[in-house]
Swiss-Prot record:
Name of the protein in question: NADH-ubiquinone oxidoreductase chain 4L
Cysteine pairs bridged by disulfides in the record: none
Annotated function: Core subunit of the mitochondrial membrane respiratory chain NADH dehydrogenase (Complex I) which catalyzes electron transfer from NADH through the respiratory chain, using ubiquinone as an electron acceptor. Part of the enzyme membrane arm which is embedded in the lipid bilayer and involved in proton translocation.
Catalytic activity: a ubiquinone + NADH + 5 H(+)(in) = a ubiquinol + NAD(+) + 4 H(+)(out)
Transmembrane intervals: 1-21, 29-49, 61-81
Name of the encoding gene: MT-ND4L
Keywords assigned: Electron transport, Membrane, Mitochondrion, Mitochondrion inner membrane, NAD, Respiratory chain, Translocase, Transmembrane, Transmembrane helix, Transport, Ubiquinone
Annotated InterPro entries: NADH_UbQ_OxRdtase_chain4L/K, NUOK/Mnh_C1-like
Family, per entry: Belongs to the complex I subunit 4L family.
GO terms under cellular component: mitochondrial inner membrane; respiratory chain complex I
Amino acid sequence: MPYIYMNITLAFVISLIGTLMYRSHLMSSLLCLEGMMLSLFTLNALLSLNMNFTLSTTVPLILLVFAACEAAVGLALLVMISNTYGLDYVQNLNLLQC
């Protein structure tokens, strides 16, 4: 396995560990999720460049669209929670249930 793939996989694992460890604040969870999506996008882009299958070039773009939607929804949720409760704790997400 080339070193670039190992580095990208390591970046994904570090972001995953960060998501699992720093779950108290929503902003840190969102940053770790963005790191995971960025490493997945980079890995998919590199793999699609190495493959000779032409339809595989659209997969990184679709993943990038999903990452942008996830970031927009996460930031909207963060703004709503911080305006309502004044804090960005993940525990406040339970208070939003009907």
